[in-house]
Amino acid sequence: MISRKSVITFGMVAIPIGMYTTTTDNDIRFNQLHKEDNSRIRYKKTCAHCGKEVKTEDIVKGYEYDDDKYVVITDEEIEKIKTEKEKSIQILHFAQLNQISPVYYEKTYQAVPETGGEKAFELLRSALMAEQKIAIGKTVMGTKDTLMAIIPREDGILISTMFYADDIKAIQKQYTKPEVNEQEFNMAKLLINSMDTPFDPSKYKDEYQERLRSLIETKISGKEIVAAEPESAGKVIDLMEALKASVEKAQKDKETA
């Protein structure tokens, strides 16, 4: 589903694009019910002044500039103050592909060229891939000046909205780094390499959501809920022994895969 249309601009080049959401929410949602009769809980929007219920079409946006004093702002007024530049994604500069910490990325979209923009789109994608660069751009989304990363892929371009530096919290708690001896370090590297396989997202499922869905189906059918088998905690052993045992298990798992 298309989220919005925009134009990527850099220099004198303009590339019309559609931005599509890349994820879907599959989480199970629960409704709030009245304990006595299992009826749905409803909420009403009411006016704080007169107490009347207010319909959606009668609700406007307002900014509180003083205690209980508001100025009403319409969507049309918000749209009017956007410049032509702000309606497009203006590329500000380019950076190394692996330079930006993942903590700055917020929401990701797939960019697809609109009719007439295919060649310029492919030129940007292939040039970014060849140079291993990403583009940093800016546009207005909603009521916010939004920073964006334009990320090349073999199969297209992704656009991620980004947090600003002052949106990111400083690391809340540091830790004292203990000494690691060479034998432990080498064994840890061996474990990492023994578990190294290409990333295949189709292999991973939300197993807890699957069990939750099974619980719901069991309750609907009136069957008894069976508790999951407890996993053995295992004994606390020496770090080196744990690393060795983990390497052996990983190697066996690879052989039987």
From Swiss-Prot:
SUPFAM superfamilies: SPOC domain-like. Transmembrane segments: none annotated. Signal peptide: none annotated. GO terms for biological process: DNA recombination; double-strand break repair via nonhomologous end joining. InterPro entries: Ku70/Ku80_beta-barrel_dom, Prok_Ku, SPOC-like_C_dom_sf. Keywords: DNA damage, DNA recombination, DNA repair, DNA-binding. It comes from the Bacteria. One of its GO terms (molecular function) is double-stranded DNA binding. Residues 9-184 form the Ku domain. The keyword Cytoplasm does not apply. Homodimer. Interacts with LigD. Belongs to the prokaryotic Ku family. With LigD forms a non-homologous end joining (NHEJ) DNA repair enzyme, which repairs dsDNA breaks with reduced fidelity. Binds linear dsDNA with 5'- and 3'- overhangs but not closed circular dsDNA nor ssDNA. Recruits and stimulates the ligase activity of LigD. HAMAP family: Prokaryotic_Ku. This is Non-homologous end joining protein Ku. It comes from Lachnoclostridium phytofermentans (strain ATCC 700394 / DSM 18823 / ISDg) (Clostridium phytofermentans). The lineage of its organism: Bacteria, Bacillati, Bacillota, Clostridia, Lachnospirales.
